[in-house]
């Protein structure tokens, strides 16, 4: 192969390489905290929504319960550790907790004797 042919091939290869573009996928931040499991609860005229919901989350991930209520009650989370929150007759109440032991966790209203949800907490 002559020097002229070798030079032509090299130029052609470099020209083709310059025509391509590389698009990288945006980096994901694996250290970002997980989105919390959020449950919106309404208590109105003795009716609770939702009831007996089945949900899932993982150990130590945040769980948020948002409550709009027209009556006072106690929200009790049967978990390790246990959590209790006083519900007032008002809108926009937010309660946050996490669970440190895997298993089934019941979230209940004590005065109305209703189970809002059972949360399956995975390791």
Per-region residue spans from a language model:
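Extracellular/periplasmic metallocenter environments
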Residues: 21-26, 35-37, 89-123
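N-terminal edge beta-strand
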Residues: 32-60
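Beta-strand-rich interaction surfaces with strong enrichment in secreted/lumenal proteins
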Residues: 53-55, 82-87
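A structural detector for beta-sheet-dominated domains
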Residues: 42-44, 58, 68, 78, ...
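Beta-strand cores of secreted/periplasmic/IMS beta-sandwich domains, seen most often
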Residues: 53-71, 93-101, 105-108
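Positively charged n-region of N-terminal signal peptides that target proteins for export
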Residues: 1-7
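Short, low-complexity, disordered segments immediately C-terminal to signal peptides
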Residues: 7-36
């Amino acid at each position: 192969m002559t020097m002229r042919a070798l030079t032509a091939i090299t130029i052609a290869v470099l020209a083709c390489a310059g025509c391509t573009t590389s698009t990288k996928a945006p980096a994901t931040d694996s250290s970002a905290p997980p989105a919390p499991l959020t449950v919106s609860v309404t208590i109105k005229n003795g009716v609770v929504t939702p009831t007996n919901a089945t949900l899932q989350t993982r150990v130590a991930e945040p769980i948020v319960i948002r409550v709009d209520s027209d009556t006072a009650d106690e929200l009790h989370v049967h978990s390790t550790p246990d959590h209790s929150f006083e519900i007032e007759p008002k809108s926009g109440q937010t309660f946050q907790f996490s669970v440190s032991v895997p298993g089934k966790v019941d979230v209940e209203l004590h005065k109305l004797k209703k189970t809002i949800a059972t949360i399956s907490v995975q390791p």
